[in-house]
Swiss-Prot record:
Role noted for this protein: Subunit of the oligosaccharyl transferase (OST) complex that catalyzes the initial transfer of a defined glycan (Glc(3)Man(9)GlcNAc(2) in eukaryotes) from the lipid carrier dolichol-pyrophosphate to an asparagine residue within an Asn-X-Ser/Thr consensus motif in nascent polypeptide chains, the first step in protein N-glycosylation. N-glycosylation occurs cotranslationally and the complex associates with the Sec61 complex at the channel-forming translocon complex that mediates protein translocation across the endoplasmic reticulum (ER). All subunits are required for a maximal enzyme activity.
The protein's name: Dolichyl-diphosphooligosaccharide--protein glycosyltransferase 4 kDa subunit
An annotated GO BP: protein glycosylation
Residue ranges, annotated region (Disordered): 37-60
TM spans (from-to): 7-29
Gene: OST4
Family: Belongs to the OST4 family.
Subunit annotation: Component of the oligosaccharyltransferase (OST) complex.
Annotated membrane topology: Single-pass type III membrane protein
Family annotation (InterPro entries): Oligosaccaryltransferase, Ost4p_sf
Sequence ranges of Low complexity compositional bias: 41-60
Organism this protein belongs to: Candida albicans
């Protein structure tokens, strides 16, 4: 059988590991969102190109 001390050690280890994983996930998630905000998205470029094409056709 597992003793109370072993169970306590296992519970603390898993708790500590889960907190560390949450912190790492948050750091990665935040950095990804910042990178997405800084770089222009390809959908914006496509939309902008489409609007330019439509506008040039209307002028003719």
């Amino acid at each position: 059988m597992i003793t109370d001390e072993q169970l306590n050690t296992i519970a603390l280890t898993f708790g500590f590991a889960s907190i560390i994983l949450i912190i790492i996930y948050h750091a990665i998630s935040t950095n990804v969102h910042k990178l997405e905000d800084e770089t222009p998205s390809s959908s914006f470029t496509r939309t902008n190109t489409t609007e330019t094409t439509v506008a040039s056709k209307k002028k003719k």
